Curated annotation (Swiss-Prot):
One of its GO terms (cellular component) is cytoplasm. Pfam families: PCRF (PF03462), RF-1 (PF00472). It is found in: Cytoplasm. Disulfide bonds: none annotated. SMART domains: PCRF (SM00937). PANTHER family: LD18447P (PTHR43804:SF7). PROSITE patterns: RF_PROK_I. Gene3D superfamilies: 3.30.160.20, 3.30.70.1660, 6.10.140.1950. Methylated by PrmC. Methylation increases the termination efficiency of RF1. It comes from Pseudomonas fluorescens (strain Pf0-1). Belongs to the prokaryotic/mitochondrial release factor family. The modification N5-methylglutamine is found at residue 237. This is Peptide chain release factor 1. One of its GO terms (molecular function) is translation release factor activity, codon specific.
Length: 360
């Protein structure tokens, strides 16, 4: 293991011992804010420190076994050879585990997200496919116990959505969905196609982490134009008869957000402001993320909205993710909410990329 990583582990071990003492301090125990913060840090460091102690123990065993290789007793030397082999194999595993634990954590992974799906090329068929994608993510959210709340929708003439915006709330939502941003392409025979010809359509997906209120970008009210209008409901008793829908324009950037799903104008405005904050934050971080991705030639992680990331081929029952050359012949299961089968290989590839960067 690199000396820099061993040095970092020594520092973390010292901090862990410091936290152990702090959590037994009466003043800290009486201050619940400090106690919770220290307890969280302790819980995060504990598996790392335990792994490091085990690593040091195995290193000691290896040194002892290597010393026995010079023993005059041939039986002892034979036993030492086996112990050296086992210790070296275990060290490789322990070092790999510790490197993974030391990978930088994305502070946004635990956040809720705003999911934007927009129909691109393909007209009505693209809108229908937008609906398919939204159902896929909604069913995946159900499987994980997340809550999905539509903020704004513009339905297609023949079904689906020209655009749909939703907020997804739950555990580790961004951590799971962050690599879904990009262009999703569908190849299939549209229901309106009489000749049976396969058409290609596309939709764009954007996944934006919801900023923490304490970290949200400060927005000058003078930079905003707020318009109200009547929600374009589907009809019936829930159609708004008041101007409860909200459209907010951030004048310096031209960014526009709308929220029309709540019957309360106040709630729609609060949702729209949260979404606007997420979009402005995304604009600030996108350039830096793209620069890092370009410099390190990341296979995944740039989040470029225009990048074609995945193809759904109905004739072959195939889903292909172009970033990691992953092809699965389980399209129906994936669209039914089984998108984890695509997400997990992407996360594994990203982790492998981070590990490679540590070794550079």
């Amino acid at each position: 293991m690199k000396a820099s990583l061993l040095n970092k582990l020594d520092i973390l071990q010292d901090r862990f011992e410091e936290l152990t003492a702090l959590l037994g301090d009466g003043e800290v125990i009486s201050d619940q804010t400090k106690f919770r913060a220290y307890s969280k840090e302790y819980a995060e460091l504990e598996p790392v420190v335990q792994g490091y102690k085990k690593l040091l123990g195995v290193q000691g065993d290896l040194e002892g076994a290597q010393a026995l290789l010079k023993d005059s007793d041939p039986d002892m030397r034979e036993m030492a050879v086996e112990e050296v082999r086992e210790a070296k194999e275990l060290l490789i595993t322990l070092e790999s585990d510790l490197q993974r634990m030391l990978l930088p954590k994305d502070p946004n992974d635990g956040r809720n997200v705003f999911l934007e799906i927009r129909a691109g090329t393909g007209g009505d068929e693209a809108a229908i496919f937008s609906g398919d994608l939204f159902r896929m993510y909604s069913r995946y959210a159900e499987r994980r116990g997340w809550r999905v709340e539509i903020l704004s929708e513009n339905e297609g003439e023949h079904g689906g959505y020209k655009e749909v915006i939703a907020r997804i709330e739950g555990d580790n939502v961004y951590g799971k969905l962050k690599f879904e941003s990009g262009a999703h392409r569908v190849q299939r025979v549209p229901a309106t196609e009489s000749q049976g010809r396969i058409h290609t359509s596309a939709c764009t997906v954007a996944v934006l982490p919801e900023p923490d209120e304490r970290e949200a970008i400060e927005i000058n009210p003078a930079d905003l134009r707020v318009d109200t209008y009547r929600s374009s409901g589907a009809g019936g008793q829930h159609v708004n008869t008041t101007d409860s829908a909200i459209r907010i324009t951030h004048i310096p950037t031209g960014t526009v957000v709308e929220c029309q799903e709540e019957r309360s104008q106040h709630k729609n405005r609060a949702r729209a402001m949260a979404w606007l904050s997420a979009k402005l934050n995304d604009q600030q971080t996108a350039a830096a993320a793209n620069a890092i991705a370009s410099e390190r030639k990341l296979l995944v992680g740039s989040g470029d909205r225009s990048e074609r990331i995945r193809t759904y081929n109905f004739a072959q029952g195939r889903v292909t993710d172009h970033r990691v050359n992953l092809t699965l012949y389980s399209l129906d299961e994936i669209l039914a909410g089984g998108v984890e089968a695509v997400i997990e290989p992407l996360l594994a590839e990203y982790q492998a990329d981070q590990l490679a960067a540590i070794g550079e």
